[in-house]
């Protein structure tokens, strides 16, 4: 038996429990999400890695990033984007694309890169973002344990291949890894028929699900009605995610469909989505309220660092709807670790 440590930045803690050391460099990176595509191609500064040196269009938005600052491993579960990081990203980004100065910012968020540590690089900029696959049997004398870390989202299939090949070698399995040649579900090269009366919502689904969008198409009027108007997410797409994609909460639904990721940041679609989640997964009313509270709390968390202008107005209206009208407050959050984010008090 082989245990694979693929816990990202938390991999150092997992390794510690196994009695080995994987020295991680927790490098926090913050990003800004703008309300529409300011261009249709990636813009990257040709310079040594620095703050705000890449702008990436994706779906209906634009992502500007990133920063790089070392943070304590204890803080990675409760990251917050600071005002200074927002100002740095915006000032540097405007030099890259001047129109960003007048483009609405929807939210800010941060993540932590699972870099292998180096003592002589306090910022983490010079540390390789390459894949690190550790065989702890040859490295530490611990059989049946490997760590796969480093890398980036774009290289995750290569990471899977390296880890799988090492596992197969240890288990004496000689079959080749096929992840580099077998398309992911939805990426198959086949023609997809577009319904004549659903052009916009179907194109949105096609971008999210590829050839699987055919499985979501429906002639049912209710299934074709919109749950999320910003991202053109239909009832049928939500049903498909709940029935076929291992979705158990609104936040997991967001990752599958982009519900709540548009301009209103869940203000108008959260309750619609919650209704379907509750009905199809048979959640109790208490669980549903907690689900809504946790989802809206995370939306507010991303809006807080950029709460000015239209984004502040949107956040205020969301607060009035969910706290004043619906009566949702901190007591409704799903876990005691959650903290209510009231943008009006920031």
PLM region descriptions:
Residues 2, 13-16, 21-30, 34-63, ...:
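C-terminal catalytic lobe of FAD-dependent flavoproteins
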Residues 7-8:
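Glycine-rich, N-terminal phosphate-binding loop of Rossmann-like dinucleotide-binding domains
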Residues 178, 183, 188-226, 275-346:
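Intrinsic disorder at enzyme termini
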Residues 269:
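Detector for the c-type heme attachment site
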